Amino acid sequence: MRQQQQQQQESRFKRTCVFCGSSQGNKTTYRDAAVDLAKELVARGIDLVYGGGSIGLMGLVSQAVYDGGRHVIGVIPKTLMTPEIIGETVGEVRPVSDMHQRKAEMARQSDAFIALPGGYGTLEELLEVITWAQLGIHHKPVGLLNVDGYYNSLLTFIDQAVEEGFISPSARRIIVSAPTAQELMDKLEEYVPYHDRVASGLNWETGHLGF
């Protein structure tokens, strides 16, 4: 308990946004990783922001964080707010009008981003917050929980894009990855944004995002 309280005091994050699949995947390691991440957030005194609902890895993370006594914010487009589609959401529900507002609200509420294994939606959310960091819209850390090497192919692709001149070496450093929740959180806690922003001279109107 003493160690847990110390971790809570030391964490730089109040809320972390977790992107993950609405499926649980085919391996138990994905489900275990989702619960481990939730426990790590609870141990560090960090609240959760996610896409809402109780299905897939999203449901596992949110339920474990909620059961651990932390606040959970589920951001859901009104069209999807039916039990048949997303199940029941624990904690606080914040309805939004569409998918674009969902991502903006999730980003506004969060101090960091983590992607668990997931599909198209997870990748789209992940790549958008990486792009926002590259453009200087935010300076929040972005982490990949690379469970069983799930994201190895994506990281290889990004490294190839660096080699081919489409992503700068400094922008490659935006992405923080680790195979376990504890290691990833340690890296995110230490993260300092030192990449060269692509559009550093621009004055983004980001008040609606809270950046």
Curated annotation (Swiss-Prot):
GO cellular component terms given for this protein: cytosol; nucleus
Tissues in which the protein is found: Expressed in roots, leaves, stems, tiller buds, shoot apex, immature inflorescences and flowers.
Binding-site positions, substrate: E84, R102, K103, G119, Y120, G121, T122, L123, E124, E125, T131
Cysteine disulfide links: none
EC number annotated for this UniProt entry: 3.2.2.n1
Single GO MF annotation: cytokinin riboside 5'-monophosphate phosphoribohydrolase activity
Keyword entries, A-Z: Cytokinin biosynthesis, Hydrolase
NCBIfam families documented for this protein: Rossman fold protein, TIGR00730 family
Record-given protein name: Probable cytokinin riboside 5'-monophosphate phosphoribohydrolase LOGL3
Lineage, uppermost ranks: Eukaryota, Viridiplantae, Streptophyta, Embryophyta, Tracheophyta
Gene designation per UniProt: LOGL3
